[in-house]
Amino acid sequence: MKRRIFTLSGILIGALTTLVSSPALALYEQARWFTLDNGMDVIVIENHRAPAVHARVVYKVGALDEAPGQFGIAHVLEHMMFRGSPAYHGRGLLPGQYDGELGRIGATDNASTSANVTSYYALMGSEHLELFIEMNAILMNGLTADSDQLENEKGVVLQEFRQRWENNPTARASHAMRAALRGASAYDHPIIGYEEDFLGLTSQDLLDFHADWYQPNNAALIVSGDVTPEDVLALARKHFGDFPAGDVPERIRPDAERAFEPGFETVTDALITKASARRAWRLPEVVAETGPEAFRSRYAARLLTSMLTSGLDAPFTRYLQTERQIALSAGFSIVLDEGQDWAMLNVDPVEGMDAVEVLDEAEDFLRNWLANDLTEDRLNRQKRRLMNGLVYAADSVDGPAGSFASLVASQSDYGVYLTLEDTIAGVTLDDVREIAALFLEQASQPRTLALEPLEE
């Protein structure tokens, strides 16, 4: 097939052009990006340290793409993909055959559904990569959607729903807080969906959803490990190349539809085993784009929170857990998510302490620390920790595949990895102070959530 040429960050790149030039992330220098004629992305990261590969097929569809009345369909479809597929290139899959064949060769496989993507992935010996690619091409071609199999999988999903959602008041309350922070109704439902919705799904519903979204031009094959780009491209062309590009529905990402409502809420439930509290603030928009400048701001926020909370010597840990001994754990995060930006503080108090009182003291310490104790030395230490973590992840079989899958999920420019080390190194103390000022000076009034066990 004819190779396409793309312009990325002002550099003309072809199918065999290096994506990452950072010496600290040497393995990312092996990353190659191809696009088949039908629009399917193929990303390959070479790592010949061990004769193994991590491969995943990522579809750009998730819970945010579901229609009202069908909440949970992306997750149910993920389950049903392993329950039989019609023949493609002369071969189909029986129920359980996908997992069975991967298990037979010693592979470990799984699948996951998120707000933005659905992924199918496996870790295996590199000599078995074609089997994974071949079977995932069969999955892309279609599913049997047998009604009896569907009813069985609904039962499995219902058990998950009861464990993760219905019988988990902490998860429900936390999800509601995050949905309120985002401000758009599309975030209100959990990824697993609602019982009345997923139990009402039909085989035709799943077939229609698959036909809409499981298209080559809405998918990426990502392979990391003991492979060559040329070999992976040949396998991708062999098994995925005959699919025509499809008409994929427009993905609508919701803007905030409602104002953030500050306030205080207490959730008391017999299923809550220990008290905790969290407090959240809506922040003004920092960056809406998904390119390198957005990554710079996000890494500034990440470095800021790491300076405060990472490690046993972290100021937050030392003050709340060692000096005051009032919390078992505590955390603070700032999330910059394309205009839906927020901060959250959470504490788990020691037994006998009031969770909200501990939360108040944690906030007082946080504000004082952000205003007075940000230093160049602390920033540089966290930069080194962050870079070390990225290097260690890059030197694993699955780490690079996960990194590129995250870019697919966020629809970010693949070029952000061209200058990743420079982006992190270039974060200044002023950048970090600017993020801190968002919280200290421009945040909304907070919303506080207290979770308490039901007293007998």
Residue ranges of model-derived segments:
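C-terminal regions of mature proteins
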Residues: A220-I222, E289-T290, F332, N346-D348, ...
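M16/insulysin-pitrilysin zinc metalloprotease superfamily fold
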Residues: L123-K154, G311-L312, G331, V335-A393
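Mature N-terminal segment immediately following signal peptide/propeptide cleavage
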Residues: L27-R56
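Non-catalytic, conformational "gating/processing" segments within enzyme and secreted inhibitor domains
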Residues: K154, L206-H239, S444-Q445
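An aromatic/glycine/proline-enriched structural segment found at the starts
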Residues: G183, I191, A220-V287, E452-E456
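Bacterial N-terminal signal peptides
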Residues: S9-V20
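M16/MPP (pitrilysin/insulinase) zinc-metallopeptidase core fold and M16-derived inactive scaffolds
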Residues: R56-L123, H189-I192, S310-I326, D337
